[in-house]
C-alpha cells in the first residue's frame, strides 16, 4: 500500500474523525467559557472587590522609555485565565462523571444451581445409607 493510501486509511478511521470533532467542539466550548469568564464573571468579581478590573492588574518591572513599551507581569490576566481553566476543568469533570454513571455495570453471572441428581442416583444413595445401618 502506498504512503498516501495508508494516510487515507488512517485519517478515515472512526477514532481520528471523532477526535477531530472533539477538538473543534472543545475549541468552541473554550471560547464560550473564556467569554463567560471575561465578560460576565470577572466584572462581577471586580464590582464585589471594589471596582477592580483584573485585566489591568500588573507589576511593572521596567517603565516605558523612548517608544519601548513597559515590561510588565500581567498577573490579572493570569487570574482570569486560571478561573477560565477551573470552570473548564469542572465542566469536564461533570461530563466524565455523568458518562461513567450512565455506563452499565456488567451483570454478574448467575451462579448455576447444581442439577438435581437423577432418580437412580437417589435410589442408590438411599440403599447405601440403609446398608450402612
UniProtKB/Swiss-Prot annotation:
Q: Where in the cell is it found?
A: Cell inner membrane
UniProt-listed InterPro entries: Mechanosensitive_channel_CS, MS_channel, MSC/AndL, MscL_channel
What is the similarity comment for this entry? Belongs to the MscL family.
- From the UniProt record, report the name of the gene that encodes this protein: mscL
Explain the purpose of this protein: Channel that opens in response to stretch forces in the membrane lipid bilayer. May participate in the regulation of osmotic pressure changes within the cell.
Q: Give the source lineage, highest ranks first.
A: Bacteria, Pseudomonadati, Campylobacterota, Epsilonproteobacteria, Campylobacterales
What protein does this entry describe?
Large-conductance mechanosensitive channel
User: Sorted alphabetically, which Pfam families does this protein's record hold?
Assistant: MscL
Checking SUPFAM superfamilies in the record gives: Gated mechanosensitive channel
- Give the record's membrane topology: Multi-pass membrane protein
List the GO cellular component terms: plasma membrane
What residue intervals traverse the membrane? 10-30, 76-96
Q: Which UniProt keywords apply?
A: Cell inner membrane, Cell membrane, Ion channel, Ion transport, Membrane, Transmembrane, Transmembrane helix, Transport
Cited HAMAP family: MscL (MF_00115)
Q: Name one GO molecular function term.
A: mechanosensitive monoatomic ion channel activity
Subunit structure of this entry?
A: Homopentamer.
Top-rank taxon: Bacteria
Amino acid at each position: 500500500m502506498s504512503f498516501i493510501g495508508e494516510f487515507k486509511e488512517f485519517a478515515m478511521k472512526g477514532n481520528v474523525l471523532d477526535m477531530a470533532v472533539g477538538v473543534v467542539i472543545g475549541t468552541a466550548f473554550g471560547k464560550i467559557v473564556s467569554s463567560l469568564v471575561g465578560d460576565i464573571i470577572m466584572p462581577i468579581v471586580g464590582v464585589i472587590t471594589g471596582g477592580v478590573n483584573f485585566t489591568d492588574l500588573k507589576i511593572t518591572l521596567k517603565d516605558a522609555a523612548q517608544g519601548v513599551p513597559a515590561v510588565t507581569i500581567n498577573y490579572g490576566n493570569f487570574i482570569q485565565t486560571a478561573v477560565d481553566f477551573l470552570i473548564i476543568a469542572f465542566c469536564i469533570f461533570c461530563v466524565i462523571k455523568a458518562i461513567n454513571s450512565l455506563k452499565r455495570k456488567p451483570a454478574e453471572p448467575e451462579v448455576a444451581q447444581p442439577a438435581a441428581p437423577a432418580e437412580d442416583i437417589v435410589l442408590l444413595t438411599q440403599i447405601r445409607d440403609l446398608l450402612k445401618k
